[in-house]
Amino acid sequence: MASEQEILSGLAEIVNEETGLPTDSVLADKSFTDDLDIDSLSMMTIVVNAEEKFSVRIPDEDVKNLRTVGDAVAYISQAQG
């Protein structure tokens, strides 16, 4: 099971691969849409990659609740058990 810091680092790498944003700009308090300018298609790619990386399932209906990077970190941490 990954720590929240490891999850944050992993998500930053995934966001970097998808968008080209520097990993150090992907912080827990950043909004995916407002701060990082990630559209819904890119968000779905990020979710799929996060599911694979962290061995979790994030149902489509839960994705809309992941507004910030921190929301995603908390969700993945909880989903890992």
UniProtKB/Swiss-Prot annotation:
The modification O-(pantetheine 4'-phosphoryl)serine is found at residue 40. Its main location: cytoplasm. One of its GO terms (cellular component) is cytosol. GO terms for biological process: lipid A biosynthetic process. Disulfide bonds: none annotated. 4'-phosphopantetheine is transferred from CoA to a specific serine of apo-ACP by AcpS. This modification is essential for activity because fatty acids are bound in thioester linkage to the sulfhydryl of the prosthetic group. Pfam families: PP-binding (PF00550). It is found in: Cytoplasm. InterPro entries: ACP (IPR003231), ACP-like_sf (IPR036736), PP-bd_ACP (IPR009081). Keywords: Cytoplasm, Fatty acid biosynthesis, Fatty acid metabolism, Lipid biosynthesis, Lipid metabolism, Phosphopantetheine, Phosphoprotein. GO terms for molecular function: acyl binding; acyl carrier activity. Residues 2-80 form the Carrier domain. Pathway: Lipid metabolism; fatty acid biosynthesis. Carrier of the growing fatty acid chain in fatty acid biosynthesis. Belongs to the acyl carrier protein (ACP) family. This is Acyl carrier protein. The lineage of its organism: Bacteria, Bacillati, Actinomycetota, Actinomycetes, Kineosporiales.
